[in-house]
Amino acid sequence: MTRKALAAGLADLGIDLPDEAQQKLLAFRDLLLKWNKTYNLTALRDPAQAISHHLLDSLAILPHVGSGNLLDVGSGGGLPGIPLAIARPELSVSMVDTVQKKTTFLQQAVIELALRNVTVHHARVEEMQGQYAQISSRAFAEIGLFISLTRHLLAPNGRWLAMKGVRPDDELKALPADIAVEAIIPLTVPGLDAERHLIILKAGS
C-alpha cells in the first residue's frame, strides 16, 4: 500500500521516477522515522502521512528546480534536499543545518542511501562560502531573513526557492527593492489538505 500511495502521488504530480528512485524515497522515509524516535527530527510519526507531508510535499517543487547546483538551507530532516537529490541524481545538492544531531542524521542518510550527489554542512549559513545557482528553504525563516542570510551565496542569475504554506503577501511586501519575485506558484500536494506555495525570487542588478 505504501508503494502504491507513493506511485499514485508521483503520478498526480506528473513526476515519472524509476523503481530504484521510488525505493530510495521509501528507504529515506523509513530512516527518517527510525531516527526520529531518538532525534526528534519531525513531528510526524505516521508512515503514510510521511509520504504526503514529506516526500510528495518536497517533490512538488521538482518541476521548478533547474540544473544548477542547489543549496538547501535549514535542511533539518533532509527536506526537500534528499527527495530532490534522489529524484535528480545528476543534481548537485548541498544541505546545511546548525543543529549537529540533524546533520549527523543527514550524513548517515547520505551513506545508507548511497547519495553521491549530496554534501552535508554543519554550519551557520551566513558563515558559509561558495556560489549556488539555486537556494531552497522549507519552513526555515521569513523570506526576507532567508534572503539576507544567503545572498552572498547566490550565484549571478541564481534563484531562491522558498517553500511556504499560505501565500506570504506580507513577507513579499517587506522585501528589499532590489529583490524581484519571479513567480508565485500554488502547489497541490496529493494527500495534503493545506495551502502550499513556491516563491521564486531573484536579485536585481
Curated annotation (Swiss-Prot):
Q: Where in the cell is it found?
A: Cytoplasm
Q: Which Pfam families match?
A: GidB
Q: What is its EC number?
A: 2.1.1.170
Give the superkingdom in one word.
Answer: Bacteria
* Full protein name: Ribosomal RNA small subunit methyltransferase G
**Looking at the UniProt record for this protein, which Gene Ontology cellular component terms does it annotate, in alphabetical order?**
cytosol
- PANTHER family hit by this protein: S-ADENOSYL-L-METHIONINE-DEPENDENT METHYLTRANSFERASES SUPERFAMILY PROTEIN
